[in-house]
Amino acid sequence: QVVFDKIEECFDDQKKSNKKEFALLSMDIDFFKSINDTYGHPGGDEVLKAVANTLRDACGENIVGRVGGEEFIAIIESKKDKTLEEYCESIRKSVIDLSIPFQDNNINITISGGVIKSSEVKDQEEFVNIADERLYKAKEGGRNQFIYS
């Protein structure tokens, strides 16, 4: 809920003061069901923790949160002099670089995401819905990627 409250706050601020554009990333761990099926819920939990920590580190001062299951959302207000595409690519690579130790294995994963800029929409509901639609396009298009349109 904190993430959705922050989205509302960002839209309100943008309307009041012509605040700079921000973006929403809707992200999902690829093939998470297979991870749970292979390693059980304890293995899945380790993956979720590792991804949450990695996203938190990769997103820095930006807001990131888990919104259910294996889905995460990030609100990107600061990109540290990177383009949005470069920023998302660095997130994707940081997840790929994970090697999550579990029992006698190392679990490797990828992440897919849908991206939208606040300038593309008029309200927060449309903002979230379009990001989710783009996430599904990323999944259908082969996974391990971010989709921007």
What do the predicted segments below correspond to?
Residues H41, E85, Q103, I116-S149:
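Catalytic-core segments of nucleotide cyclases and related cyclic-nucleotide turnover enzymes
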Residues D37, I75-K79, I96, S118-S119:
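Residue-level recognition of strand-loop junctions within catalytic nucleotide-signaling folds
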Residues Q1-A23, D30-D57, G65-G69, I73-A74, ...:
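Conserved long alpha-helical elements within nucleotide-processing catalytic cores of c-di-GMP signaling
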Residues A58-I63, K80, E120-D123:
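Short glycine/proline-enriched coil/turn segments at helix->beta-strand junctions
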Residues I63-R66, I107:
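A short pre-motif secondary-structure segment
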Residues L24-S26, Y148:
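Core hydrophobic beta-sheet residues of small sensory/regulatory alpha/beta domains
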